[in-house]
Each structure stands twice: as C-alpha cells, then as structure tokens.
C-alpha cells in the first residue's frame, strides 16, 4: 500500500494556521482609524453645549408679566372709613311728603331710617363738592310734651369727608361723638326734605 503525500507542506500549514488566528483575533493596532472616531461628534456636541452662555432668566417672566397686568387692572384702594353714630328725630307733619307716605305703612322709626340712608348718600356728595355749606341744618319736628321718637343708627364715613363735616359742625372740637352725629344726620335729612319742595321755607 502506497503512502499518500500530504496536500500542504509543514511550513504552509503553519502559515495557514497563523492567518486563521489573525482573522478570529484581529490585532488592535490594525483596526482602521475611523472606528475610533465614531463617538467624536457626540463629544464635540457636548462641549459646544457646555460652552453656550445661559439665557438670562430676567428677560421675560410670565409670572411677573401677569402680576403687572393684574395690578394695572385692579381698582384703586377704597378710602379709609370710620364708623359714625347718628341720631335724628322724625319731621313734623307736612315737612316731607316722602315721610308722610312711608309712615302710613311703616313705623316712624322705620320710615325715618329708610329716608336717612338715602339722605346720607346725597349728603356725602354735598360734603365732597362743598354745597353743604349753604344747605339747611335743621327741620321742624313735632311739638309734643311726650318723649319724641329718636332714631339711632351708625354708618361708615370716609375719613376725608368726616373731617370736613366735623370742621363745619364742630369747629371747636368740643362736641361729643353722639352730639356731632345728631347734627350730621339732622343736616342730611334737612337737605333731603328741602329738595322735595325747594320753595318750602321753614
């Protein structure tokens, strides 16, 4: 039986084995340079982002803009007010047509209170424009030996108008609080009654 001659020599077989090992385990030094540069753009982007200057926060603030808008649309603060204790007596018959009509349905106190609220509203305007200085300060009341009705109430008055009224009705500052309130309410009612019939002369 003849011996078969190998297809490759010993040296060729060694070269083939070395070549196969290089295919499965490539040499890092032989890797193309492009593989190491794959992540370079990302790193460059990160550095660029870090170098960008921060945007100033005070350029525009929605909360601040909203606050300024609300302040501009808000009504002005209301004037400071003080409570004033008022008192007045019902008018004599035929002094006020309004009172004479109301007293047919309500008590004298209730009727006068309803008129006094309106009279004080009007008198505040008179204090503001100065027309109260030439207005009547009193009106006729019933002549009776019995104790007449005294209506008492209170009202919040603007401080500025209250100072004007006090300087007029109590220039010396000696009146008590209730005495001043009685003069103020009486003057307000007198002005209201006078406007019902301007020709009336008490």
From Swiss-Prot:
BP GO annotations: regulation of DNA-templated transcription
Chain intervals with Basic and acidic residues compositional bias: 36-56
SUPFAM superfamilies: Ribbon-helix-helix
Region entry Disordered, spans: 24-56
Keyword 4Fe-4S found: no
Matching NCBIfam families: PRK13862.1 (NF010436)
Something else known: The Ti plasmid contains at least six transcriptional units, designated vir loci, which are essential for efficient crown-gall tumorigenesis.
Protein name per the record: Protein virC2
Encoding gene (name): virC2
């Amino acid at each position: 039986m003849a011996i078969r001659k190998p297809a490759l020599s010993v040296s060729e077989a060694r070269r083939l084995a070395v070549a196969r090992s290089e295919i499965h385990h490539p040499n890092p030094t032989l890797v193309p340079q492009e593989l190491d540069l794959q992540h370079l753009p990302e790193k460059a982007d990160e550095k660029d982002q870090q170098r960008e200057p921060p945007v100033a926060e005070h350029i525009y603030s929605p909360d601040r803009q909203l606050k300024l808008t609300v302040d501009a649309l808000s009504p002005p603060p209301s004037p400071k007010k003080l409570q004033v204790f008022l008192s007045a007596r019902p008018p004599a018959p035929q002094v006020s047509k309004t009172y004479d009509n109301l007293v047919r349905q309500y008590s004298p106190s209730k009727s006068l209170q309803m008129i006094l609220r309106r009279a004080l509203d009007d008198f505040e305007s008179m204090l503001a424009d100065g027309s109260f200085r030439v207005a009547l300060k009193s009106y006729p009341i019933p002549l009776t030996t019995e104790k007449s009705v005294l209506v008492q109430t209170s009202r919040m008055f603007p401080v500025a108008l209250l100072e004007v009224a006090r300087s007029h009705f109590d220039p010396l500052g000696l009146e008590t609080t209730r005495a001043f309130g009685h003069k103020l309410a009486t003057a307000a009612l007198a002005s209201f009654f006078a406007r019902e019939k301007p020709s009336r002369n008490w």
